[in-house]
Amino acid sequence: MATPVKKWLLRVAPWFLPVGIVAVWQLASSVGWLSTRILPSPEGVVTAFWTLSASGELWQHLAISSWRALIGFSIGGSLGLILGLISGLSRWGERLLDTSIQMLRNVPHLALIPLVILWFGIDESAKIFLVALGTLFPIYINTWHGIRNIDRGLVEMARSYGLSGIPLFIHVILPGALPSIMVGVRFALGLMWLTLIVAETISANSGIGYLAMNAREFLQTDVVVVAIILYALLGKLADVSAQLLERLWLRWNPAYHLKEATV
């Protein structure tokens, strides 16, 4: 059993490196080793964050970016899950869909930005389409992989107990594939923000990416850093949310049990 002190150290350990980096960053800025034209001090970044927050501009852009990300992820994730289920559960579905999907997956979706702008312009549809496209493939692949790697002995045993069709899917196939599906979700959440960052910096008139690009035009490096930190925090928040869902939905799986840390 870990002592309370060890438990506390394990909880705060992930913050040691970020706090150390910020401390060195502030020191380098204070003594003049780091020019504010290259990188503003942490104090300057906090001031810029407070100014943008007080004016409401930051929250407006944050809400728009979050809306784009969630809508795009919902569309792409749903399509990826459905197509993955079809390919994973049906050999004919795999023959019909998998080759085409794999060909599309090997085309970098961000390379389609010029074409997407021609199709949709710079309105919301373009960003949502790119996010949906970027999040579709990780969930599709991991859904297919999860279904195909279910222990066939479990499936046969369930059938011997009279399970088939939808009950078999709900009680055996879906729980067995869920760990792999959640891995796909976590990958997709990372790609969601990556795609949105690029899309908003190229074709947008609102959002955090637009805020950063607009600040660049006026050499406001503090605002650019605020935008970068926001993207990092949003990505971390999305990953933590996925981890919590894993622990909730997979609490029956010993691999996802919360264990006491031991040293």
Swiss-Prot record:
CDD domains xref list: TM_PBP2
Family note: Belongs to the binding-protein-dependent transport system permease family. CysTW subfamily.
One Pfam entry name: BPD_transp_1
Record protein name field: Putative aliphatic sulfonates transport permease protein SsuC
Cytoplasmic side: 1-13, 65-68, 123-125, 186-187, 239-263
Species per Swiss-Prot/TrEMBL record: Escherichia coli (strain K12)
Reported function: Part of a binding-protein-dependent transport system for aliphatic sulfonates. Probably responsible for the translocation of the substrate across the membrane.
Entry's Gene Ontology molecular function annotations: ABC-type alkanesulfonate transporter transporter activity
Alphabetical UniProt keywords: Cell inner membrane, Cell membrane, Membrane, Transmembrane, Transmembrane helix, Transport
